[in-house]
Regions:
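RecA-like helicase/translocase P-loop NTPase motor core
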Residues: 1-207
Length: 207
């Protein structure tokens, strides 16, 4: 599924005639006790890319909430420009609602709480800095959790877990712009009913 998503995104990106720009995540290990495997696992758990490839004109989706900067997880937009000012880089994005923002890299911190007497101290173990966006032509159901998507085309060919269909369809904020897509060569109604998996514990609870 990830391969299919990546292929769609790269295919759409390749059709843009603007130059390709790559941003690599900047990782800093502040505590030498942290093992590389532990650090890698933490980075993979974040909703960002270690290597972000974009072009001006690309459709993107925001991957975190940043109330102060006026962008939210699941919002979409188009890259208008990439600006280099002294030692800073900004990505100019026009969101679907028409608002224009200058996006800066976002820093995630790996932290632990340490008790010091009666107080607790926050220790920073590591950090990773990256632009919190991804290409938005396609995304997996798992990665879409928590997002609100305005225009959604949902491919239901690979539904296999309880509640997965609900997670996928409930991302849509507007039923009028929701499209359900399947390439299965069987009756759609039969297939849809078959993948509408409900956990037995939920059924038992509502009896």
């Amino acid at each position: 599924i990830n391969k299919k998503v990546n292929n769609i995104n790269q295919e759409k990106l390749s059709k843009l005639e603007t130059p390709l720009v790559c941003f690599k995540a900047q990782v800093k290990k502040e505590d030498k006790r942290i093992k590389d495997e532990e650090l890698d696992s933490w980075i993979r758990s974040l909703n960002i890319l270690e290597e972000l490839n974009i072009k001006i004109g690309a459709r993107i989706i925001f991957c975190v909430n940043n109330w102060d900067k006026n962008y939210y997880n699941g919002e979409q937009g188009i890259i208008e420009d990439i600006l280099y000012e002294e030692e800073k880089i900004y990505i100019s994005i026009i969101k679907n609602n028409g608002m224009k923002i200058l996006l800066e890299p976002y820093t995630f911190f790996m932290e632990e709480l340490e008790q010091s007497g009666k107080d607790f101290v926050v220790n920073i173990l590591a950090s990773v800095t990256q632009f919190p966006i991804k290409l938005a032509y396609a995304i997996t159901i798992h990665k879409s959790q928590g997002m609100s998507i305005e225009k959604l085309v949902c491919d239901i060919d690979h539904i296999f877990e309880n509640g997965q269909l609900y997670v996928a369809l409930s991302r849509a904020t507007n039923p009028n712009t929701l499209k359900i897509y399947s390439t299965k060569k069987i009756n759609f109604g039969f297939y849809f009913a078959n993948i509408l998996k409900i956990d037995s514990n939920v059924i038992e609870f509502y009896k």
